[in-house]
Amino acid sequence: MPKTISVRVTTMDAELEFAIQPSTTGKQLFDQVVKTIGLREVWFFGLQYQDTKGFSTWLKLNKKVTAQDVRKESPLLFKFRAKFYPEDVSEELIQEATQRLFFLQVKEGILNDDIYCPPETAVLLASYAVQAKYADYNKDAHTPGYLSNEKLLPQRVLEQHKLNKEQWEERIQVWHEEHKGMLREDSMMEYLKIAQDLEMYGVNYFSIKNKKGSELWLGVDALGLNIYEQNDKMTPKIGFPWSEIRNISFNDKKFVIKPIDKKAPDFVFYAQRLRINKRILALCMGNHELYMRRRKPDTIEVQQMKAQAKEEKNHKKMERALLEDERKKREQAEKEKEKIEKEKEELMERLRVIEEQTRKAQQELEEQTRKALELEQERKRAQEEAERLERERRLAEEAKSALLQQSESQMKNQEHLATELAELTSKISLLEDAKKKKEDEALEWQTKATMVQEDLEKTKEELKNKVMSSHVTEPVHGENDNDEGDESSAEASAELTSAAAYKDRSEEERMTEAEKNERVQKHLLALTSELANARDETKKTQNDIIHAENVRAGRDKYKTLRQIRSGNTKQRIDEFECM
């Protein structure tokens, strides 16, 4: 039995190990990878490797893995990457797994500065990346420093602004909060919708020369072929949509593109190496096929995938809605519980106050009762004293009467008796005064006792009312593989004609996400203003200067596309030859 070969395939978020046979083809390995990761939108992807000369190359699916220029090491190393890009991510990327792989690959390209991204857009994209990873911002879980170990911005952007790590985090965190309620997969899609408007997104650049020998860049992307000047990879000068191209071929380093327009001459350029022409041909064939496929009705398989994805998304939305409803109910229950606890505390405090008031009232009542008893005793004593004085007065009256009688009978002792009578009269007068005084005192004590009794009755009534009010009831709460050609082959060609989609150039009518989406537009304007004060103008790169000039001129990716495709094919080819 032949000895197996170890293979390691690295996707954007996983590392896979396989054992393959020496006879295993590129397609068999590719199929094994996509099956393992559960990917169905396979036409965008390919397996990339470094050949023995150190060049990055795509694995040919129709050849044995071992027959290709793969470095003989163990394990054999491959990267599973997007080889072709969609025109519109929101229309073409169906599966969540596909969306995630594109999101991670595009994010890596932006962070590595392979795709130029202006600072304000970089911060906004970073906030979507944070939402995709951490979900909704939570101040209790996402404490200061929660992004300190994350690479979220290109190094160029960090160096161009006088902001420290904490200040960058603060800005990203503010926009992270703005995305509350957005699903992780929706955050990734929002990231891609903005990123696809970046000028360098999805473009494969190749160094070429025209017949004059001018050094230029050829850009191959989902929409066609574009020509760039040597010092500007962001603003194409001439464009050819796939619908204008009939045939592409190369002979050694010479590459020939035949337009559909028979009046137009061939579009000829020269590459530095034969292998570059092979790669250009493969990319042209793949991108052209996808371009035409998009302009035809969806296949049954794609229709099924879209229906399934829609069903899964709706199911997730329902689950999300249920979870959100549960969260709201839980928050409401917590609020109710807090309210009940607060009401309970308030009631307990009121009860304590009432009890304190009752205790004080009871003390006052007892004091008043004691005073009332004392006053009653005083009254009784005064009354007894008055009665005693009354008795003494009567006795004095009787004595006076007796003395008068004696006075009549004993005239002899008249002087003596008169003196005695005067004394008794004086004594009687004093006793009457004392009696009157005691009667007045008794009356005064009687009045005081009556008032105390009334106060006592009033206090009893108040106490009764307070006790009644204290009984408060608490509330009840409740790929078509595109062979780049054999290394021995120095020429190849491919027919690209497809009359059905010749006139469909809807991409020229597109608008950027910022132009369509007012919310994104506002966010970008706010970020531009916010970062302006911290920007170090001395650290601007060539791309920054080009971008700023494009913004000032009112140009964007799609307006530029319309402009560079204007005029007939012949005019544009002539323009290319003059560059």
Curated annotation (Swiss-Prot):
As for subcellular location, the record says: Cell membrane; Cell junction
**Knockout: what is the outcome?**
Morpholino knockdowns show intersegmental vessel and axial vessel tube defects from 39 hpf onwards resulting in disrupted blood flow. Loss of intersegmental primary lumen in intersegmental vessels at 32-33 hpf, vessels instead show a narrow and disorganized appearance without a visible lumen at 54 hpf. Reduces zo1-expressing tight junctions and cdh5-expressing adherens junctions along the length of intersegmental vessels during tubulogenesis between 32 and 54 hpf.
- A GO CC annotation given for this chain: adherens junction
Which residues does UniProt call coiled coil? 306-448, 517-551
Basic and acidic residues bias locations: 376-400, 502-519
Q: Tell whether Metal-binding is among the UniProt keywords.
A: no
Membrane topology of the entry: Peripheral membrane protein
Which Pfam family is one of those matched by this entry?
A: FERM_N
Instruction: Indicate the segments forming the FERM domain, all copies.
Output: 5-295
The domain of life is Eukaryota
Q: Where is the composition biased (Low complexity)?
A: 490-501
Q: Which UniProt keywords apply?
A: Cell junction, Cell membrane, Coiled coil, Membrane
Q: Which InterPro entries match?
A: Band_41_domain (IPR019749), ERM (IPR011174), ERM_C_dom (IPR011259), ERM_FERM_C (IPR041789), ERM_helical (IPR046810), Ez/rad/moesin-like (IPR000798), FERM/acyl-CoA-bd_prot_sf (IPR014352), FERM_2 (IPR035963)
GO biological process, alphabetically ordered: blood vessel lumenization; endoderm development; positive regulation of early endosome to late endosome transport; positive regulation of protein localization to early endosome; regulation of cell shape; regulation of organelle assembly
GO molecular function list: actin binding; cell adhesion molecule binding
Q: What is its main location?
A: membrane
Q: Where is this region: Disordered?
A: 308-341, 376-418, 464-519
SMART domains referenced in this protein's UniProt entry, alphabetically: B41, FERM_C
Stated role: Positively regulates endothelial adherens junction formation and stabilization. Is thereby required for intersegmental vessel luminal membrane formation and stabilization during tubulogenesis in the early stages of development, independent of blood flow dynamics.
This protein is called Moesin a
Native source organism of the sequence? Danio rerio
